Amino acid sequence: MRAELYEAIKAKIAEAVPEIKHIDLWNHNVEFLEEETPWARPAVFIEYGTITWQPLQGHGRRGRGEVRIHLVTDWAEGQYEAAFALSRKLLQAIEGLSGDEFDGMALMATDTSHSHEDILENIDTYAVRYYLSEP
């Protein structure tokens, strides 16, 4: 289900927000900019939060979790409006996204990180419901 969600988010962003130049899984990417292989910006990193599971009667499990979308753009004085507009385009693209093993993607929270000198990081947190069939 996480792989399906990741691929669905990636495909939807590539289709609806072509300005995004790099999409990957989150691994504290912005904390080690000088140490990592450079990636093109604007970039999106997808982070999974904890999923809590409840059994369904005899046919799988239903889960609830969070997915955080990290939008990373270059920082330039007065350019925050473009980053916020790009964040809005991402919301319009992935709000309500669904698949065979997930649905109900809904924006819950938005944060802006001011902890970096050369980049701006906007983080949107979405609620998502998962379905896991029994093996």
Question: What is each residue range found by the language model?
Answer:
Residues 42:
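A solvent-exposed, acidic/Ser-Thr-rich amphipathic alpha-helical stretch
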Residues 1-37, 45-135:
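Charged, amphipathic alpha-helical segments and their flanking helix caps
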